[in-house]
């Protein structure tokens, strides 16, 4: 928080920081931060609803309770660098009333993660026709936040929902920062779930492209059918089952009452 304050203090804008406590029971240092004119509010959730839903709840709260022009959702672990907030603000002059995304140009993960990230991008494009190169580190004008909080897929995937509601974006180049402390607690299984949740937002695209793949592939193997050649089709069926199961996370009724999961909002 103090790093954000340092980076934005010379920008001619009024800033507020909203920290989402996602139901954590861990103790933290309750010292007051030196933030000069920046207002800091902590939104504490009663239960942990996951990363995407915590962001969605925060955006809904800000839209309904606060007066603002732009919101910049970002992780608080250091991987979304405060240095790049000024880039977002400067870009609002060029991308008027548009969502601006932070596209990663340099990543700090190992080769294994990088490999699976490339696989994720390929599968996303192959099955949805969408190239998604960003996460939640974005700059959203109020008009986009308004659309975001009435879109049911926002309760499932942040980036997937944003691509669904917006036809075009502005962008800045973003470098992944180093974590402030410790390794990420997100498991490989949760990373896979996160990836497939993005794809599940476009389940109808997935159906159409899967049917086309099935027809073309079956035509190719028609004269050479065996357990080996039909194995990819079994994998496709399993993939479709998972995608449709994850798409059930899109629940506008739960999203509409998400503010009831807020225990308190207090200044820090």
Regions found by a protein language model. Name each.
Residues 45-47, 51-61, 70-73, 79-156, ...:
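Acceptor/aglycone-binding surface of glycosyltransferases and processive sugar-polymer synthases
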Residues 113-128, 190-204, 208:
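Short hydrophobic helices that act as membrane-entry/anchoring signals
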Residues 4, 58, 77, 123, ...:
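Residue-level signature of catalytic and energy-coupling elements of molecular machines
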Residues 21-29, 78-79:
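A conserved acidic beta->alpha catalytic loop
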Residues 92, 143-205:
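Catalytic donor/gating beta->alpha subdomain of glycosyltransferases that bind UDP-sugars
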Residues 13-24, 43-44:
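Short beta-strand/loop segment that forms part of the nucleotide-sugar
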Residues 2-14:
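Short, acidic, metal-binding catalytic loop of nucleotide-sugar glycosyltransferases
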Residues 207-268:
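Terminal low-complexity segments of carbohydrate-biosynthetic enzymes
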């Amino acid at each position: 928080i103090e790093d954000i304050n340092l980076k934005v203090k010379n920008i001619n804008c009024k800033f507020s920081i909203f920290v989402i406590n996602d139901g954590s029971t861990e103790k933290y240092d309750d010292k007051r931060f030196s933030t000069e004119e920046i207002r800091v509010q902590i939104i504490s959730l009663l239960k942990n609803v996951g990363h995407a839903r915590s962001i969605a709840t925060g955006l809904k709260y800000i839209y309904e309770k606060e007066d603002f022009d732009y919101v910049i959702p970002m992780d608080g672990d250091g991987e979304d660098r405060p240095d790049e907030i000024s880039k977002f603000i400067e870009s609002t002059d060029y991308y008027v009333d548009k969502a601006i995304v932070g596209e990663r140009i340099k990543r700090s993960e190992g080769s294994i993660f990088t490999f699976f990230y490339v696989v994720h991008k390929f599968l996303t494009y192959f099955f949805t026709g969408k190239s998604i190169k960003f996460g939640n580190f974005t700059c959203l004008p109020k008009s986009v936040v308004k659309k975001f909080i009435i879109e049911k897929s926002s309760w499932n995937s942040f980036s997937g929902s944003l691509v669904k509601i917006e036809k075009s974006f502005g962008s800045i180049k973003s470098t992944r920062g180093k974590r402030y402390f410790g390794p990420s607690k997100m498991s490989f299984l949760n990373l896979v779930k996160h990836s497939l949740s993005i794809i599940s937002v476009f389940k109808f695209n997935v159906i159409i492209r899967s049917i086309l793949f099935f027809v073309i592939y079956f035509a190719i193997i028609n004269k050479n059918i065996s357990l080996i050649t039909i194995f990819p089709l079994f994998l496709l069926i399993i993939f479709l089952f998972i995608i449709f199961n994850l798409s059930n996370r899109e629940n506008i009724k739960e999203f509409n009452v998400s503010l009831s999961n807020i225990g308190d909002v207090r200044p820090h």
